[in-house]
């Protein structure tokens, strides 16, 4: 496996649904890069997923990654729930469709070439990188520029 990279992510939503954004910090050795984007109408879970997806999709070659998120939804979804969702044709145990399936499928694709250690950190607990991503996500949510077409298409 290639480079060892750290990725820190956070999503934010001003209302749920409402304007939202994601923030990402990528670190390789002494190099850091931040990414963020805001959406006019979305949900907090979609922004948490987008943060992880964008962080992973930014990498140009397979890497060994430690990805830190404050979202149990993302961490549990990708490490525990996704296997059964895929077996059931992207349905939950009660046969209902998986929420945010467009993003779960995109995340599933994004992880396929990497070796990832998924870490969870409590949000708003003073973790420097998580706090920085939270600031990026909130700023993006306050200045949205994009339409979350997946949210619009998958709305009940």
UniProtKB/Swiss-Prot annotation:
GO cellular component: cytoplasm
Keywords: Cytoplasm, Endonuclease, Hydrolase, Magnesium, Metal-binding, Nuclease
Pfam families: RNase_H (PF00075)
Species of the source: Photorhabdus luminescens (Xenorhabdus luminescens)
CC cofactor note: Binds 1 Mg(2+) ion per subunit. May bind a second metal ion at a regulatory site, or after substrate binding.
Domain of life according to the entry: Bacteria
NCBIfam families reported in the protein's UniProt record: PRK00203.1
Name under which the protein is recorded: Ribonuclease H
UniProt key word Cell membrane: no
Disulfide partners: none
EC number: 3.1.26.4
């Amino acid at each position: 496996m290639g480079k060892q990279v750290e990725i820190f992510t956070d999503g934010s939503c001003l209302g749920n649904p409402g304007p939202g954004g994601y923030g990402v910090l990528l670190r390789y050795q002494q190099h850091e890069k931040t990414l963020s984007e805001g959406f006019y109408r979305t949900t907090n879970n979609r922004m948490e997923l987008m943060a992880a997806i964008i962080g992973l999709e930014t990498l140009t070659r397979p890497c060994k990654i430690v990805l830190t998120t404050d979202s149990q939804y993302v961490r549990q979804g990708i490490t525990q729930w996704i296997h059964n969702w895929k077996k059931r044709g992207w349905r939950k145990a009660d046969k209902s469709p998986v929420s945010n399936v467009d993003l779960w499928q995109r995340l599933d694709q994004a992880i396929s070439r990497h070796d990832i250690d998924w870490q969870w950190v409590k949000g708003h607990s003073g973790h420097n990188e998580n706090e920085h991503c939270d600031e990026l996500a909130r700023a993006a949510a306050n200045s949205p520029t994009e339409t979350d077409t997946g949210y619009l298409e998958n709305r009940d």
